[in-house]
């Protein structure tokens, strides 16, 4: 039995609120149960130096957690003077995932920076960030098209992400913190709206997992991501 009484395949209630802030070209509050992340997309003309003159754009991401997003306060990374390895890993994951769904040539020499700020953490912050960031990205691209900065839609497809794992010997989807911290296997999966895999991060925390369990976890992730994409589409419509 899961602590929340959810079935193994059941995700937490998922909410996506668009236009959550006033200034960003795209802004979304995404909620996976008690995990809440603010995702903003900022569109700027021009690209990093390494891409100048190549006729293509760039999408990148930054990730951070507010000091009291967790049970006890943690120092801001800015106050410590450097980002943790975890933060760097997560923001690179978010950036890679988002670049997979954008036609960089159609974006032109423009840059979109996605900022994912965790307001409240209860497991799955990186997968919630990717899910919300995709919707914020869509809004930023639509803003640029409306302004005539880009001519065609660079979005190739929607993407979403979910955590899956083995908890007390059972494969489950969308782990909350109490499950994540005790899981035998923890995995983050990013997929397209049609179920193609963009990235898998999987670790055996307590017990090695079998090939059969891997396939079961990927099946759980695929079904959950299909449901999450439906939430994205409903928000965008």
Swiss-Prot record:
Keyword tRNA processing assigned: yes
CDD domains, per the entry: RNase_PH_bact
Reactions that this protein is recorded to catalyse: tRNA(n+1) + phosphate = tRNA(n) + a ribonucleoside 5'-diphosphate
Enzyme class: transferase
A GO term for molecular function: tRNA nucleotidyltransferase activity
InterPro entries recorded: ExoRNase_PH_dom1, ExoRNase_PH_dom2, ExoRNase_PH_dom2_sf, PNPase/RNase_PH_dom_sf, Ribosomal_Su5_D2-typ_SF, RNase_PH, RNase_PH_bac-type, RNase_PH_CS
Family stated for the protein in its record: Belongs to the RNase PH family.
NCBIfam families: RNasePH
Known partners and oligomeric status: Homohexameric ring arranged as a trimer of dimers.
Protein name: Ribonuclease PH
Organism placement in taxonomy: Bacteria, Pseudomonadati, Pseudomonadota, Gammaproteobacteria, Alteromonadales
């Amino acid at each position: 039995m899961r602590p929340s009484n959810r079935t193994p395949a059941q995700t937490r209630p998922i909410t996506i609120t668009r236009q959550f802030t006033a200034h960003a070209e795209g802004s979304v509050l995404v909620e996976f149960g008690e995990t809440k992340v603010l995702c903003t997309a900022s569109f700027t003309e021009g690209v990093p130096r390494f891409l100048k003159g190549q006729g293509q754009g760039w999408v990148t991401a930054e990730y951070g957690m507010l000091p009291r997003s967790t049970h006890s306060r943690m120092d801001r990374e800015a106050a410590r003077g450097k980002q943790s390895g975890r933060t760097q890993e997560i923001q690179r994951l978010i950036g890679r995932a988002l670049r997979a769904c954008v036609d960089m040539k159609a974006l032109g020499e423009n840059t979109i920076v996605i900022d994912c700020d965790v307001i409240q953490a209860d497991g799955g912050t990186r997968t919630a960030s990717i899910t919300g960031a995709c919707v914020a990205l869509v809004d930023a691209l639509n803003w640029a098209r409306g302004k005539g900065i880009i001519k065609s839609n660079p979005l190739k497809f929607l993407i979403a992400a979910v955590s899956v794992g083995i908890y007390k010997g059972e494969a489950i989807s969308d782990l909350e913190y109490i499950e994540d911290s005790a899981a035998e296997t923890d995995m983050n999966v990013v997929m397209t709206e049609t179920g193609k895999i963009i990235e898998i991060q999987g670790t055996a925390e307590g017990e090695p997992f079998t090939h059969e369990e891997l396939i079961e976890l990927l099946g759980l992730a695929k079904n959950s991501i299909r449901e999450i994409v439906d939430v994205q589409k409903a928000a965008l419509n």
